[in-house]
Amino acid sequence: MSGLFIGRLVIESGLGTLAEAMDLYPGARIDVIGAGPEEARIAGHPRIRLFGRVGQSEVLARMREAAYLVLPSLSYEDVPRPLVEAFANGLPVIAARIGRLAELVEPGRNGLLFEAGSARDLARRLAWAEAFPEKMRQMGECAKADYRARFLADWNYPILFGERRRAARV
């Protein structure tokens, strides 16, 4: 069972937290897709496979193989594209409790949250994910349902235009 990280390899992506968590919990393996100045920090780690920049077909292939997506971000992001893609592909997300990540990831339903910057807390979540693969699969199903409910136009346009109609009447 392995996880997946997709993003820019920069300090604010939380790669230091991820690498430290991997040291604390030696059972985890993570595939990393992305490039950037923090690449050297994780390049030699024995349980991190670095793929660099890849095309969308390779991203989707890695998502199909992964048990979860990990987003150890240290910065307040709106809605990271990797989260949306993970949800669309039925992949639960283990994310830092920061910004919109804390709103979109519902612990025990579509993923798990850990305290931003805490390698120890992330290591605990990775260990839990490895210990309960069936629950993670169920969370992936919920993540896919959340994608349909929150991000697809055919679900959201009626809500948006209904609100606009109501606002126009006021």
Regions found by a protein language model. Give the residues of each.
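Acidic donor-binding loop of glycosyltransferase active sites
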Residues: 64-78, 91
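Nucleotide-activated donor-binding/catalytic signature segment of Leloir-type glycosyltransferases, i.e.
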Residues: 40-60
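Conserved acidic donor-binding segment of nucleotide-sugar-dependent glycosyltransferases
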Residues: 107-108, 112-119, 128-133
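C-terminal alpha-helical cap of glycosyltransferases
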Residues: 149-170
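Short hydrophobic beta-strand element within catalytic cores of glycosyltransferases
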Residues: 92-95, 105
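A short, well-ordered alpha-helix in the C-terminal region of glycosyltransferases
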Residues: 128, 135-149
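Short alpha-helical segment that forms part of, or immediately flanks, the ligand-binding pocket
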Residues: 60, 78, 83-88, 102-103, ...
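Conserved donor-binding/catalytic core segment of Leloir-type glycosyltransferases
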Residues: 1-13, 19-23
